[in-house]
Amino acid sequence: MTRHTGHYVLPFEQLRMIDVDSVGGKNASLGELISQLTEAGVRVPGGFATTAEAFRDFLKANSLDTRIREVLDALNADNVTDLARVGAQIRQWVIEAPLPSRLEAEIRTAYATLSARCGEGISFAVRSSATAEDLPDASFAGQQESYLNVAGIENVLDRIRHVFASLYNDRAISYRVHKGFAHHDVALSAGVQQMVRSDLASSGVMFTMDTESGFPDVVLITASYGLGETIVQGAVNPDEYYVHKPMLAAGKQAIIRRQLGSKLIKMEFADAAHGSRSVRTVDVPLTDRSRYCLSDADASELARYAVEIERHYGCPMDIEWGLDGIDGRLYILQARPETVKSQSSNRQQRYKLKGHSKVLATGRAIGQKVGAGPVRLVDDARDMERVQPGDVLVTDMTDPNWEPVMKRASAIVTNRGGRTCHAAIIARELGIPAVVGCGDATHKLSDGIAVTVSCSEGDTGNVYEGLLETEVTETADGPLPPLPTKIMMNVGNPQLAFEFAQIPNQGVGLARLEFIINNNIGVHPKAILDWPNVDADLKRAVDALSRGHESPRAFYVDKVAEGVATIAAAFWPRPVIVRLSDFKSNEYRKLIGGSRYEPEEENPMLGFRGASRYVSADFAECFQLECEAMRRVRDEMGLVNVELMVPFVRTVGEAAAVVQLLASHGLARGSGANADGSGGLRLIMMCEIPSNALLAEDFLQHFDGFSIGSNDLTQLTLGLDRDSALVAAAFDERDPAVKQLLARAISACRAAGKYVGICGQGPSDHPDLAAWLIEQGITSISLNPDTVVDTWRSLGGVSAPQ
């Protein structure tokens, strides 16, 4: 018995989550949203639902319950051919069966009431809601059908029968067997909901956590033009937005990262000229593809809805939304518990490639694992049976129909799709790495060749030539010994920040800008500033990279700010020390346009780099771009845990000049402090030249502390080129001369009451050096992420000086 026993049809506003047994997870959740969150400003289109009781009585009235049970009991669901035959037979039985007169009458009455409330010209979506769907331990992602832009009661009645039939889709039957659900225990509720005119605007899916790492403090929004089915199906590569929950709550500009998708097609309402089709797919104009389909204001509003919904449900949520192109408002269309990352254990497996080879294809990484095997190229769904255990499935796009064979694959690679499409959801649930939205994977990868599919390197997934060796380490949460020194982390790639932030740490001792400039921008800053007065080839390259941004200059600042903000948000509120760019001239030359602007130096390691660049008139305008990005991260985004570090300061005069230059760009020491004095900007200097340690007291007059760069300090103390294999054996940070300078720098900072940390490679490679540094009284040790836990444990019991 349920509280709605005896009812065949119920309006959404009468439903709550306790009604899952009556109307399934999807429809119960719509009722919960309407009845409980409308006052919080969350808008949900109205509608009604048929009940599980109505579905079961429909089957009984047509003697379908026993017939269906008999054929399913005899079915081997692993036999794809038999599965397709039996599924088609059952669906035909259901579609051809008449609805009981009482059920039809109640649907007609509910439809008339809803139509009167919505007004003329409104159409409806008819969607499925299984009684075992969207529960925290199962995802029935897209297994039953949805029908869009359905108008008129006769069409609604017909689509409800088709929705009932979709409980017996091949993928749904297979999934129930795989998850251990008895077929007769699952019933179907049909939801009839007013359509939002997102065909005239945009729509998408959002999660209240990062889908790959499980990081909880962001909302991930995907968006594309038109109806949301193209995203859910994986037919488009959507735009992506990350919104930081703590800064959203603080009223700051909380969008920390955006990624422009290709958005090649969109689904829109079809008109009468298209016959019986209610929707159609059309190409998106090139100008629209080149811009984001959602404003920052709308992305922030969606994130606020997401936070309210998550707070109400008390768990991470998977939410579908639509922007109405007529009234300009945002609507929530569905909300269900996230079913993969929120269920994972506290033991973390980390995959790392031990080598690399030629990259054959790239796309969006799903999961964080590595898979390898022979490519199985499948152009047509009818050929999916060719996929054998251990194959790498490569196809244009997968939908949930492929689920019976997806679980055989060692990895999945597609041309189309984003991180919230059905294929991505199923791949995560099965624990299979997938690279989606490659664009050209089916052309770049030949059937039968051996490849390695890596999702372990951040947001970008790579398909490598050949079978590469992979290292898998497993860490479990557990207590770490208290230390007198903070253990921090070196982070270069913002795409890995959400994952790294979940390793025990006390902040970031070194966040490098070089990775952001190299990988997220790729263009020399002078080429950006000289645009459009550059040669045709360079202009084309800059135009292509800066699509979706107001200008190439805005693109550069946006991308630096987003990269830094992603790291700062991941570790909030712990300190994140960001080192300003320290490219050498040979490294700047490798950027697009770099050879036009950079000198060819004999020894760039000792050349035009660090603070010398910043204060040079030749580079001043380029440095201004970095400063603008840093100011945005702290002032507009509110991430005042960002501290700035100046590298390679040769003289005390240079130190004074660079601090004055930063102040002129709005980055003065102590600026941006809160009313209580907290959050003021700290400026840290890299102590990496012998002169820095020898004249430490003089340098410290201009900075709030030192971060020791042991790599450069060692090579400059011992006269070694650290890039030369000929003298590599002599490179050792534990050399007495180096340790004397380390001790000198640490003691000077302690005497001045200022911060002193180390961010070089030494402590990661040599735990004995880390222990010695603690004994000297160093404030923090910043380690590579893969050495943090082991080094921390090994240092238990080491004492600092009193």
Question: For the regions a protein language model found, what residue spans apply to each?
Answer:
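Extended active-site and interfacial segments that coordinate phosphate-rich ligands
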Residues: 141-174, 198-273, 333-364, 408-415, ...
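Acidic, glycine-rich flexible loop/linker segments
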Residues: 65, 326, 337-347, 360-392, ...
